[in-house]
Each structure stands twice: as C-alpha cells, then as structure tokens.
From Swiss-Prot:
GO terms for biological process: cysteinyl-tRNA aminoacylation. A motif ('KMSKS' region) lies at residues 287-291. This is Cysteine--tRNA ligase. HAMAP family: Cys_tRNA_synth. Its main location: cytoplasm. Residues 187-220 are annotated as: Disordered. Zn(2+) binds at C29, C230, H255, E259. It holds the Pfam family DALR_2.
C-alpha cells in the first residue's frame, strides 16, 4: 500500500516514493538549547518520533538525524542566570541535558545522530566557502551573506516574492547587505550586547561587551549564522539530497526557506523531497511559546500527568491540524489513555486465566483485531493521521471489553492478538507504554530486594568486612544502583 505525506513545498499530499526504501533519510529541526523545553516543542518531537517509528514498522529502513543548536544569541542571553554558568557552552550543556531527560521521559526513540552546531563549525565554514566560490554568497565587514536574488526559487516554500520580503537580521547588518532579505551565513565577532540583551530576562543585569564562542575563518573571527547550521549537519550526516525534512510550522520562513536556498545552491540537487511542518500547539488561542510566557514545561507536565497522558495528548491530533492545550483536552487524553491501558490489562489478565483456553474462537473479537490493524495502517499511510490511528485502537479497546464482559470463558488467541495489537501499534508506533498490572508489583519487589542488600552491606561495613561491602556496592552499581558512602551514611541513587 502507498504511503502519502503532505509537502509544504508543493502544497499537496503526495505519494512517498523514496529513492532507497531501505535507507530513508529524515532530518528533524531540533531545539535551541536556551531554556527548558515546553509542550510546544514536545509536539514536534513526538510527531516526528511517530513518523519515523511508523516508517520503520512499515518496513522502511530509516536514518533519522535531529540537531541540537548549542550556538545562539538566545543561549548567550542566559549567561549568569540561575547559576547556569558564565559561558555560552555551560548554559548549552545544562539545557542539552535537560532536553535529553525530557526526551527519555516521553519515550522518544533515539535518533541515529544528534549533531551539535559547536562540533560542526569546520563543515559549516567549508559549506559557506563553497557558496562564496559559486557566487551565491559574499563577504562584507567580516560577515558573509547569502544573496537571495541569485537563487531563482527563493520564496517558493513560503509563497513569497523576494522584493516583498521584510529585512532579515538586526539593523546593524542592513548597511552591509546587497538586499534587505539577504541573510547571514557567518557573523563577524561574538554576540553583541544589543543582540544578547534583546533576549535577556528583564530581571537579569544587562550584558556588556561581546559574548559567546567564536571561531577562526577565512573571513575573520566569528560565528555561524542560524540557517547554515542545519544544512551543514544534514549534508554531513545524511546526504545532499534527503527524503523528509520535519520542522515546526513557525520555521517555514525564514529558516527552511533559507535552508533550501543555501543547500541547493551549494549542491545543485533538490535538498528535500518532502517538507513536513507540524502545526503549533496553542493555549488560550495563542501559540505556546517561551516568549509569550504561556507555556508548560515538559518536565512539569510529565510529573503532573504522566508520560503516557502527555504522549496521548500530543498524538490525539494529526500533525497538520490545529491542537489546543487545555484542561478539557488533557482530560480527554487521560480518558483515552486509561481506556487503552485498562483494555490491555483486562486482556492480559484474561489470557492468564485458566478459562482462557476453554472457549473457541470469538469471531467478533478476531474481526475487531483485524479491523483495528487495518484502520490503524490506513490512517498512518494517510499522511500519519495519528488521530484516526488512536480511534482505531479505542474501537479495539471497546471490543476487548465486550468480549471480557460477555462471558466467563475467553478466546485465548483472540485476546493474545488484541494485546499484540495494543503493544505493536500503540506501543511500538505511537510510543505508549503499556503495563499489564505486574509492573508496579515488580518494581516494589525490586526495591525491597535492593533495600535488603543495602542492609546487609551496612552490616558488613559495621563489622569491618570492607572488601565484602565493596563487592556488594560494585554488584549493585552493575545493576544501575549507585552507592556513595559519606560521613552521614550511604547515599543511594536508583
């Protein structure tokens, strides 16, 4: 069956026909690590995650790259805030770890590579040099700008004309540029106080003097521009031509428009066959964003609602559709997740019962499983329609409940197939994490055993049997339990 995807560049839904189905190249624009991630960021992550999970499930070989922008004036603006450190690198390191923690909490499948801008400056400089040599870019005052009028298709992605575009970049750049819409590939020097303080919190003292990391280049000491970074990293870790480029709707212009221009000017090839843009998450009628202050961090949402409810919320609406965060939508997501989890648990419990083997096939249940699989696949092939995919699983949950409620004996194979559908479609594709009811008991038992071993170890230490105590500590650490002895006793991290 054919996979269909939307394409912002063509404005149409198209058949997905990769050059090599065993090596589908996907690039997702990641996060500028200047603050804790919020649910608006998570919507992009989760939708991109589900896309690549589905393609893998459907038999494609997928190579997925998601960048980390760790060089940016917004990061510099956070220097000295809340003990984050006094350098751009220190702030970026802090928030990069925060993003990693959030991704793990949301059960995102690992991308193949998470390239960081700071580790790809040589590749960025080489790409800029190619554009200068080809006549698509020019140096001015130690900076390098892309000449948008040299690229005939500029504006095609966003549907704009070059001469109607607003100026790109701060006022200080305008005098150096040949056209107001030209954009910076390389910026001379560090981040100016004006640029940094534009993004700095009002309660923080303003920065003075240039800040941020700089690198030597053929045009002098400076920093890469924002747009060139993604082109260089995509070309380095994927190819000059990729199959799918995913990003937030707010990146269509100027970021992705500029990516296309600089990438295709440098390589002479079509940069990406399909541009998929995830609609922004809204709250109270406005997009959720750090600048508006109307956001909910991923960590807080997961702590309050649980990772499965958050994921269910973010997949309950297709990526091309408007999505709202509110108490009502969170409540709906909670109910959907609980329905799926309860049906999965009831099916698993019924399978374990003696009566599971006593009843012949239940045609209604087995038909419901087959229908759910077919409807789920059809939904995902129709431009990753996660809303319809979730609905297919909810219909299966209803069928499972009808079967379990309607008899004292159960169709073992039918229930087994239902559990498998929940776990492969809801789990492997949508990223939900099902628990058959034994999980909490198993965790509790493991904690009790660990506590017992810690008690024995403390007794060995008290008795002076330090080698035995150290051996127990090492064996615990091999199981992921860190033990550190202090004057106040042992500190344990699990």
């Amino acid at each position: 069956m054919t996979q269909y995807v939307s394409n912002t560049r063509s404005g149409e839904q198209e058949a997905f026909e990769p050059d090599d189905p065993e090596n589908v190249l996907v690039y997702t624009c990641g996060l500028t690590v200047s603050d804790d991630a919020h649910l608006g960021h998570a919507r992009l992550w989760v939708q991109s995650d589900v896309m690549t999970r589905w393609l893998s499930h459907a038999g494609y070989g997928v190579r997925h790259v998601q960048n980390v922008t760790d060089v940016n004036e917004k990061i510099v603006a956070r220097v000295g805030a809340d003990g984050l450190g006094d350098t751009e690198a220190a702030v970026a390191a802090h928030y990069t770890q925060s993003v990693i923690d959030d991704m793990r909490a949301l059960n995102l499948a690992r991308a193949d590579v998470y390239p960081r801008v700071s580790e790809h400056v040589p590749e960025i400089i080489d790409l800029i040099g190619d554009l200068v040599d080809a006549g698509y870019a020019y140096e001015a005052g130690g900076s390098v700008y892309f000449d948008v009028r040299r690229f005939e298709e500029y504006g095609a992605l966003s549907g704009q004309q070059v001469d109607e575009l607003d100026p790109q970049g701060p006022d200080a750049e305008q005098a150096e540029k040949r056209h107001p819409a030209d954009f910076a590939l390389w910026k001379a020097g560090g981040v100016s106080p004006d640029d940094a303080n534009t993004h700095r919190d009002d309660e923080l003292p303003p920065l003075d003097g240039e800040r941020g990391q700089t690198w030597a280049s053929p045009w002098g000491e400076g920093r890469p521009g924002w747009h060139i970074e993604c082109s260089a990293m995509a070309m380095t870790h994927l190819d000059d031509h990729i199959d799918i480029h995913v990003g937030g709707q707010d990146l269509v212009f100027p970021h992705h428009e500029n990516e296309i221009a600089q990438s295709e000017a440098a390589s002479g090839e079509r940069f990406a066959d399909h541009w998929l843009h995830v609609r922004l998450l809204e709250t109270d009628g406005e997009k959720m964003s750090s600048s508006l202050g109307n956001f909910f961090t991923v960590s807080n949402a997961v702590a309050e609602r649980g990772p499965n409810v958050v994921r269910m919320l973010l997949v309950s609406t297709s990526y091309t559709q408007r999505q709202t965060y509110s108490e009502a939508t969170v409540s709906e997501a909670t109910q959907r997740w609980e329905r799926l989890q309860r049906a999965h648990e009831r099916a698993a419990d019924a399978i374990d019962s003696v009566a599971a083997h006593a009843k012949p096939a239940d045609d209604a249940l087995r038909t419901a499983v087959a229908d759910a699989r077919g409807e789920f696949a059809a939904a995902m092939r129709a431009d990753f329609n996660t809303r319809a995919a979730v609905s297919a699983l909810l219909e299966l949950a209803s069928a499972v409940n009808r079967h379990v409620d309607g008899t004292d004996t159960y169709d073992y194979q039918g229930l087994h197939d239902a559990v498998d559908a929940f776990e492969t479609l809801g789990g492997d594709v949508l990223g939900l994490q099902f628990d058959d009811g034994a999980g909490e008991d198993a965790v509790s038992l493991a904690d009790d055993v660990i506590d017992l071993v810690l008690d024995v170890r403390e007794q060995e230490r008290t008795a002076g049997n330090y080698e035995r105590a150290d051996d127990l500590r090492d064996r615990l650490e091999a199981l992921g339990v860190s033990v550190e002895d202090t004057d106040d006793g042992a500190t344990v991290r699990r």
